[in-house]
Amino acid sequence: NRHMIKHRIMSVATLLGGVIFTGHVVAQSPEVARRLDAKYDVVWPAVDGLIRVNKGGYRIPDSRMKSNGKYGYADTLGQVVVPPAYDDAADFGNGHAVVGRKAGDGRMLYGLIDRSGRVVVPLEWERLGGVRNGVCVARTGTAAKREFSLADTLGNVRSLGYDYCSDFSNGLARVGVGAYVEKENVAGITLRDAYEFCGKFGYIAPDGGIVIPVQFDDARDFAQDGLAPVGIQGKYYVKWGFIDKSGRQVVPCNFYSAEEFLGDRAVVSKVVAGGKLAYGYIDRSGKEVIPCQFDMASGFRFANTWV
């Protein structure tokens, strides 16, 4: 029932019976938790000093499913900061939160608010990423034709002119030039996103300037170690390697797959005799320190791994 759902969500907030700091997540005190629990239907743990609340809705714990209701925010003392007025909302981060409101045609349109509740980016975007490196990636258009812009916390918006743009990760965002192709649906079920992007990828800085030219057939985000897996189309499939933030190829694109480095090792795979995939490990120079020979493998953690 709803009380049980609320209790399970609040259990994180009441852990250790006080205010808890875990990164940017702050759990409110048990007294505040009880007051908020009595006032709202769903209460999330505090993030960036503010607590997301919902009135008139419910959420299934450990899932992304949620009801309509209205979203707002309270502080860690339980005082209302932003009254519940939005149809969708994310947690605060870097002093701002993405909020959404249904338009007359049923579309959810998103914007950005600051800690006082002031709208700094108007609610007119079909997707809006959280603030990273001082900007957020905004998207409008249709599923098959998307337009991307960068919006900063002062409300300035810059059109990018790319067909694809990811959120920023460790200072850079992936951009692409190409087209959206409808996914093949052999099962006859409704796909959450029926289109996928096909084209070439590069990377931009938070000011929108190109850092690594659009040239790769596939690419992933930069990790904290300053490396990103990138792919180049081979004769039969995309081959993967790694680049650094200057675009320098530090590991040649020789592998069927490549995971991000954990420490000084990364899991890679190759196609071997009979078309079988074999997994192994490389160092940061691309040398196979453990040859590709396993049916599966995981990244090194605490000097050990499983294969």
What does each model-identified segment do?
Residues 1-3:
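Short, Lys/Arg-enriched N-terminal segments with co-localized hydrophobic residues
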Residues 28-307:
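Residue-level detector of conserved, function-critical positions
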Residues 11-20:
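Bacterial N-terminal signal peptides
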